[in-house]
Amino acid sequence: MSIISEFREFIARGNVIDLAVGVIIGAAFNDIVKALVDNIVMPPIGLVLSGIDFSDLAWVLKPDDPATPALDAVAIQYGAFINTCIRFLIVAWAVFMLVKLVNVIRRREAEKPPEEKPAPTPQETLLMEIRDLLKRRAD
């Protein structure tokens, strides 16, 4: 088997395609959560906290020097980190709720009583009796 045919078989498996779809949806979900945090969640939090915009929070280690415009300020931007942590918590909560929903659905499926087999028809009953008689004669 050539390497190309092995690769084609590997790609054609459902797991690889499912993983690719999951990564693409995850990337799109990341953009949605970023927009949600930056544009909807953080403005009210900043308003409650006296108009603080977390994305602008930083510890400036070395300020801009107007004499050397090529050098930017050096700062630890902990506000961006706070936004990222909030974004992570929202994603983690969404994934938790999704897993919880899937577990509830699986539990409901497991709790359903198994479907009972229908009673044998008279013809099947007769055939089983004949089978049993033949077994007894053989013994």
Swiss-Prot record:
Subcellular location: Cell inner membrane
Gene Ontology MF terms in the entry: mechanosensitive monoatomic ion channel activity
Cross-referenced InterPro entries: Mechanosensitive_channel_CS, MS_channel, MSC/AndL, MscL_channel
Any one cellular-component term (Gene Ontology): plasma membrane
Region forming the signal peptide: none
Family of the protein in this entry: Belongs to the MscL family.
Subunit text: Homopentamer.
Protein name: Large-conductance mechanosensitive channel
Organism: Phenylobacterium zucineum (strain HLK1)
